[in-house]
A protein has these predicted regions:
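Cap/insert and terminal regions of metallo-dependent hydrolase folds
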Residues: 204-206, 213-309
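C-terminal motif of bacterial Sec signal peptides marking the signal peptidase cleavage site
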Residues: 15-17
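Active-site metal-binding motif and surrounding structural segment of the metallo-beta-lactamase
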Residues: 66, 73-138
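Active-site neighborhood of phospho(di)ester-bond hydrolases with catalytic His/Asp-centered motifs
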Residues: 82-86, 105-118, 122, 138-140, ...
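A short, active-site helix/loop in glycosyltransferases that binds the activated sugar's phosphate group
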Residues: 142-151
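Residues at the starts of beta-strands that form the adenosine-phosphate
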Residues: 32, 79, 134-136, 231, ...
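Core dinuclear metal-dependent hydrolase active-site scaffold
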Residues: 23-98, 164-226, 310-313
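Sec-dependent signal peptide recognition
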Residues: 2-9
């Protein structure tokens, strides 16, 4: 029988006083992922959005979603890591701590690139908030330079709230005796920093996280071949189809989900089910439970990342 850990979480609710309730979180006994958020950089709902897709969330707050982010947990060593630091960092860190013992911050943060939904959460590690001590932040060369030479991020470095850990494209970073991470540079709008996805290794098993890329065809590598080699794949699904937003979509290039499904249509079912679409714009119908788009994706054998879900290697 497999050993399970149970952590009792004390949730405090404030309303003219204090009340509390206990929740039980079941923790696998081998490394796993926690989906900490699924929305595009601006979150869901998005600022100034008056469309039904957003107004529905004000009537029913349970429909809201945090910005795309995944957590990796090793229950054997009681360690955790985050991939990206979003504007929802505070809530996501707390969610991740449910799966480790007596730790309030992750053991490391891997940044993919310098767009607002992917690194700005580290501000909560600074003096105005937690005033953390030497939290490891893994960053590529341009990202390290950007954080070191531009305020307010440079203050996090100079006051040692964070310690920048250098990583290089295609170079493996060993985290412990079970887990390692390899950054993979991908084409994207690199105004300030380069953009990477991450391959996560656990023994002979591998996962891939690419929340942002311009188009699969612009990458000199084959995403189809990568999928065949992986056990879990989290992929950019910002927009479901062309024309989804009322602007020139070439200004914000991403692979449309319709394009990705067509590209992946010849994969065998076992490979298709490895794929979790993530990083949804507020206009993306994959955010709507039971939508035609959701049913279409699932009928083709693909998966949709769900916030707070636990995914085993």
């Amino acid at each position: 029988m497999k050993r399970k850990w149970y952590i009792f979480i004390l949730t405090t609710l404030f309303f003219w006083g204090c009340h509390s309730k206990q929740e039980v979180v079941e923790i696998p006994n081998e490394p796993f992922f926690v989906v900490l958020g699924v929305a595009q950089d601006a979150g869901y709902p998005q600022i100034a959005c008056t469309k039904q897709c957003c107004t529905a969330t004000y009537k029913n707050p349970t429909l809201k979603h945090m910005v795309s982010c995944i957590g990796l947990v090793d229950p054997i060593s009681n360690e955790s890591w985050m991939f990206d630091a979003t504007p929802d960092f505070t809530k996501q860190v707390k969610l991740l701590t449910n799966y480790v013992k007596e730790k309030e911050v992750p053991d490391g943060i891997f940044l993919t690139h310098g767009h607002i939904g992917h690194y700005t959460g580290i501000m909560y590690l600074g003096r105005e908030a937690m005033s953390a001590e030497k939290v490891p932040v893994y960053a590529m060369p341009r990202m390290r330079e950007y954080l070191t030479n531009n305020g307010p991020w440079s203050q996090l470095v100079s006051t040692k709230n964070i310690t920048l850990q250098p990583i290089q494209n295609d170079t493996i970073q060993v985290l412990n005796q079970r887990i390692a991470v390899t950054p993979l540079q991908v084409p994207h709008r690199d105004e300030y920093t380069e953009t990477v996805g991450y391959m996560i290794h656990y023994g002979k098993k591998k996962a891939l996280f690419i929340p942002d890329i311009d188009k699969w065809q612009k990458w000199e590598r084959s995403i189809v071949e990568y999928i065949k080699e992986m056990d879990i794949v989290f992929l950019d699904a910002t927009f479901f189809k062309n024309g989804e937003i009322n602007r020139d979509m070439s200004e914000v290039p991403h692979p449309f989900v319709e394009e990705s499904m067509q590209l992946f249509e010849n994969l065998i079912p076992e490979d298709k089910k490895k794929i979790y679409f993530i990083h949804f714009n507020h206009t993306n119908p994959l955010l709507e439970e039971g939508s035609k788009a959701q049913k279409q994706v699932q009928a083709k054998g693909f998966r949709i990342a769900k916030e707070k879900s636990v995914i085993l290697f």
